[in-house]
Amino acid sequence: MPLVPKRVKHRREFRGKMRGAAKGGKYIAFGEYGLEALESHWITNRQIEAARVAMTRYMKRGGKVWIRIFPQKSYTAKGVGVRMGSGKGAPAGWVAVVKREKIMFEIGGVDEATAREALRLASTKLPIKTKFVTRSSEVGGESNEG
């Protein structure tokens, strides 16, 4: 089931700026291992769901997965072949604004090798560079550069 807000105050939002690092959500709070963003980007609800499915399938329903991001920002698109002007387009989907250093996913209840591979598979579904972090060593970690 795709992640979408139940209701929003405004259907259309400004794009906003993605300057600097994340203010919150920089530390592992629930599981033992996490996936940290090294870049700022919009992550769509479909990308989040694809990453979740990849992790749970690899872990064969073992362990627990926490999704620390939620797509609460709508983005709009005008139809194909529509001329410029005449207002903002219709809402086309939902995105989560992820800044660098944000922990996006957490895993618990599995060994480190399984968690590392599950989060690596999840990172291939995302449009940003990520880093595998553990609760004990949140300062360092291993990154997938590209």
From Swiss-Prot:
The UniProt keyword set, sorted, is:
Ribonucleoprotein, Ribosomal protein, RNA-binding, rRNA-binding, tRNA-binding
What GO biological process terms are annotated to this protein in UniProt? translation
Question: Which GO cellular component term is one of those annotated?
Answer: cytosolic large ribosomal subunit
- InterPro entries given in the database record: Ribosomal_uL16 (IPR047873), Ribosomal_uL16_bact-type (IPR000114), Ribosomal_uL16_CS (IPR020798), Ribosomal_uL16_dom (IPR016180), Ribosomal_uL16_sf (IPR036920)
GO MF terms, alphabetically ordered: rRNA binding; structural constituent of ribosome; tRNA binding
Record has rRNA-binding as a keyword = yes
Subunit info here reads: Part of the 50S ribosomal subunit.
UniProt-recorded name of the protein? Large ribosomal subunit protein uL16
Gene name, Swiss-Prot/TrEMBL: rplP
